[in-house]
Amino acid sequence: MKSLGRHIIAEFYDCDKEMLDNIDAIEFHMKQAAYETGATIVNSSFHRFLPYGVSGVVVISESHLTIHTWPEYGYAAVDLFTCGDHVDPWKAFSYLKKIFKSQRAHVVEHLRGKYDEVGIPENAPHKAVEAEMAEIF
């Protein structure tokens, strides 16, 4: 079934606690995860909380990647929302699971804007992504 976007909601457990509290590493790896999907990064913003924890967003032309960490519990909540057929959010999931040294994860995928529910013909191209890609090339 075609959709405007794919939204992966991931929970990473038993992660490297030091990694989850390192804002520079988190930002670097979230950007790298975006590149892994084939996405185009527009902007990013990250914040470190005291005494610990990091939250951040990587805005991509195709939507966004977000993270919230609880280093004291070895836990990270991650959303990977991508639009268009040329990006694969599962590549970001696999990359982050490895980088965070997550011993277990819970993940669900939600199709956003299903063509049949929005009223888009099944063979219609994704206009927003096509327009954005035209600007790049």
UniProtKB/Swiss-Prot annotation:
It catalyses: S-adenosyl-L-methionine + H(+) = S-adenosyl 3-(methylsulfanyl)propylamine + CO2. This is S-adenosylmethionine decarboxylase proenzyme. The gene is speH. The modification Pyruvic acid (Ser) is found at S63. The keyword Lyase applies. The record marks E62, S63 as: Cleavage (non-hydrolytic). The active site is at S63, H68, C83. GO terms for molecular function: adenosylmethionine decarboxylase activity. InterPro entries: AdoMetDC_C (IPR042286), AdoMetDC_fam_prok (IPR003826), AdoMetDC_N (IPR042284), S-AdoMet_deCO2ase_core (IPR016067), S-AdoMet_deCOase_pro-enz (IPR017716). GO terms for biological process: spermidine biosynthetic process. Pathway: Amine and polyamine biosynthesis; S-adenosylmethioninamine biosynthesis; S-adenosylmethioninamine from S-adenosyl-L-methionine: step 1/1. Keywords: Autocatalytic cleavage, Decarboxylase, Lyase, Polyamine biosynthesis, Pyruvate, S-adenosyl-L-methionine, Schiff base, Spermidine biosynthesis, Zymogen. One of its GO terms (cellular component) is cytosol. Is synthesized initially as an inactive proenzyme. Formation of the active enzyme involves a self-maturation process in which the active site pyruvoyl group is generated from an internal serine residue via an autocatalytic post-translational modification. Two non-identical subunits are generated from the proenzyme in this reaction, and the pyruvate is formed at the N-terminus of the alpha chain, which is derived from the carboxyl end of the proenzyme. Belongs to the prokaryotic AdoMetDC family. Type 1 subfamily.
